[in-house]
Amino acid sequence: MERLGPVFPLLGGWRSSSVRHARSEEERLVSQYVSRLGRRSPAASPRLRLHRRPRRVAMLSVHTSPLHQPGTGDAGGMNVYIVELAQRLAAINIEVEIFTRATSGGLPPSVQLAPGVLVRHVDAGPYEGLAKEDLPAQLCAFTHGVMQAWAGHRPGHYDLVHSHYWLSGHVGWLAAQRWGAPLVHAMHTMAKVKNANLADGDTPEPAARVIGETQIVAASDRLIANTAEEADELVRHYAADPAKVAVVHPGVNLDRFRPFPKGTEPGPGERVDARAAARARLGLPQDALIPLFAGRIQPLKAPDILLRAVAVLLDERPELRSRILVPVVGGPSGSGLAKPEGLQKLAARLGIADVVRFRPPVGQEQLADWFRAASVLVMPSYSESFGLVAIEAQAAGTPVLAAAVGGLPVAVRDGHTGRLVQGHDPAAYARVLRDFADNPELTPRMGDAAARHAQSFGWDSAAAATADVYTAAIHAHRRRVRSHHG
């Protein structure tokens, strides 16, 4: 197998950024976020007992920290995935140490995220002002930091390496080779898939990423795909060995994302409108059609499609203007339409600025309330490996209007828990929004079905399946080592 050595110089040719000073505000936010996460440690399900599981896993997330608020910068579904999975693995006695790049000089070397889950900050490149596109040049420094942390332990400290996203995969490849441990990798997104589904004005993924992902696929002992379609894409685009690919659906925190906040469920015989209660808490009009966008503001997520669809709807049905409200909850990320001001200007040009409300990213508890309050969550994405937000909204009792791309057809049952649209024609989305406006009973009917559908996506099941993948990877790695040594 080709060794990793030549890869880092290739990746290092990308541009570098200037160094900025760390801000104490980030440290404060990280501290608050960790304290919130640490208050919950889910109990292990009795059935999640696996034979010869790993004792300790090194999890790698180079470009985004699990301590960052989802919806800001490059923090999104992958952050939620890592946090929830790590906590559930710890609950079944698999310790997890997460290595991530330090983005502030004042961060401690390590932070306990939850019992059995440790986050290690690695110094690699400037703390701030470093775009994700510049990170390949810092992979050598990040790898050095990971090796330094490992050097303080006895051999065999980590039973397995689990890397997330292609940048982490290269570090994981080197670490796994050095430690004599198996490598499990999760792509989360793939360059070839993204490039085949680019939004207008978006930047194609570079050839270096395609080469890097191909090498990681070949080097991994096991690959985790969110859906069967993603597994097929790994085989079709990257020549992955089908025997090494395992499908594990991500989960949803069913304690947090539920029709009623925990502890507020109505008693026997009591009738309470969960949507009305959420709207009252958020100060939203009770009788409005509320199509919600929640996520990072970037071309890939296509929030502009929602705005254009609303403009089409109001052109056809101007009387709806007085009873429609379009919240856009999220922060800037990526390229092209990265700044909220770009969407604000678009709303003004379309003549709908009066019905659109831009809100910054919110914590998970308040996000759940936004889901409960919405008539429908709108996800017109050009590419989604799974779409955690779709499952979270459904768990909260809200239907989803989504593009029929990636894992969204798995997350959303078309016609039952929401609607899927082929392509990205705003008029097609406008037609579905008109259905919700003309048939108010659609939201509660589909919302009830959505909440039931989401029950099958718990994180305990995802952790159990992931632990099975770990066990298979360890056994395969041991067999390969034995065969190489006669």
Predicted regions: what they are:
Residues R15, L29-V119, R478, R482-H485:
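N-terminal subdomain of nucleotide-sugar transferases
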Residues G330, A338-P361:
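Nucleotide-activated donor-binding/catalytic signature segment of Leloir-type glycosyltransferases, i.e.
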Residues E229, G251:
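Carbohydrate-associated surface elements
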Residues D414-G415, R419-P426, D435-E441:
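Conserved acidic donor-binding segment of nucleotide-sugar-dependent glycosyltransferases
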Residues Y382:
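Aromatic "clamp/platform" in nucleotide-sugar-dependent glycosyltransferases that forms part
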Residues P361-V362, D369-A374:
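Short alpha-helical donor nucleotide-sugar binding micro-motif in glycosyltransferases
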Residues A390, P399-A402, V412:
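Short hydrophobic beta-strand element within catalytic cores of glycosyltransferases
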Residues P285-K301, L307-V310, P327:
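Conserved donor-binding/catalytic core segment of Leloir-type glycosyltransferases
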